[in-house]
Amino acid sequence: GPTPVPETVLKAMGRHPIGHRSGEFQTIVRRTTEQLKWLHQTSSDVLVITGSGTAAMEAGIINTLSRGDKVLCGDNGKFGERWVKVARAYGLEVDVVTAEWGHPLDTEAFRTALEADTEKQIKAVILTHSETSTGVINDLETIARHVKAHGTALTIADCVTSLGACNVPMDEWGLDVVASGSQKGYMLPPGLSFVAMSDRAWAAYATSDLPKFYLDLGPYRKTAAKDSNPFTPAVNL
């Protein structure tokens, strides 16, 4: 990506911008929110951020974790590598499951690490579903099952390339954070990102102490309930 954008979408984007606090825009937000929930196969709200997919993933990390938390990251490409860097930038303790670029992550390595964590120190497993840099699909369903068996850790998934192109049933797989971007399976220009959080993720949000402002998902959730946005969004997108 960016993927091809249909001509009908380009024409719609060419309209004069409407007010983001107007009733007309609220109607669009309401309809779009329901469609996003359908795409994610979730009953949870899907929040829209003006920013790239990295913004959605960073938001997923900083809204559910706290300083010094231990996380397990999967790294088998450029974006798995990026989430390791983001986690370390916020002072998280990072263990990494690696695989050679072009090869999928070993699901058994995640199972082994999670089963060994008898003191439940691992707070989240962070990985990419479809590694954009190589095209490799990681077995997110199986890894999420191992995380669920752990009992307390969250699954934070980069689905930027996969959502809209692959089946990503958020609720069925027990995913806690799903991040995506407009320029891939959505077939839109770059500029929007989307983050869905489970009830477990929102419970973690209540105790998260990592610094955040623009990417604080609390205000997004509060305004989404009113079919609005806490900041000026990319209206035409």
Segments (PLM) and residue ranges:
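A glycine-/small-polar-enriched, mobile loop at the entrance of the PLP active site in fold-type I
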Residues: 2-50, 54
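Active-site C-terminal subdomain of aminotransferase-like
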Residues: 4-5, 183-237
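Conserved beta-loop-alpha segment that forms the PLP phosphate-binding cup at the N-terminus of a helix
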Residues: 43-72, 76, 80-85
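General beta-strand structural signal in soluble alpha/beta enzymes
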Residues: 47-50, 73, 96-97, 126-127, ...
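Active-site-proximal loop->helix
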Residues: 82-93, 111
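Active-site phosphate-binding strand-loop segment of PLP-dependent enzymes
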Residues: 104-162
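Conserved active-site segment immediately N-terminal to the catalytic lysine
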Residues: 171-183
